[in-house]
Amino acid sequence: MKKIPTFDDVITFANETHMNINVELKGVSGPDGTRLSESMVQQVAEKLASLENGIDVMISSFNIPLLKLAETYMPQYRRAVIFKAVAFKADWRTILDFCGSKIVNIEDAKLTQNRVEMIRNAGFDLNVWTVNKKERANQLANWGATGIFTDKADAMIHLERD
């Protein structure tokens, strides 16, 4: 039985393989949520400081306050706002501007070519989750999506860019 890797394990793996990483910050709730959220973001920043140069890091979250904390504690890393398809509304640019982000990570459900082109033409990167069909991945790439999240990376290797 394999163990679930710790964040330290992920940092070690990234350093050994020179693999870029996406760190998704999850919300903290409860009566002490604000303090715990700040502590979590500080700890993530401390761990990421041990990454070797040249490893690209993206910090992403559905949680806007966490992305603002990431901007404070980790301004050197790119930040992405994660959207469910139904939550992507007309105020999306305001949200990204508030977070200091130039990246939209959006759910694949009902994503259209018009929406992809609108986001890309506005100067934002666009990553789509979760794309497991090769045909759909090709279509999104042809429409201009910057990247995809997939459970089937071995089937998507043809999309790798230099």
Question: PLM features: what roles do these ranges have?
Answer:
Residues 1-81, 99-100, 106, 122:
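Metal-dependent phosphodiesterase/phospholipase catalytic core, i.e.
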Residues 80-162:
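C-terminal active-site rim and adjoining tail of enzyme catalytic domains
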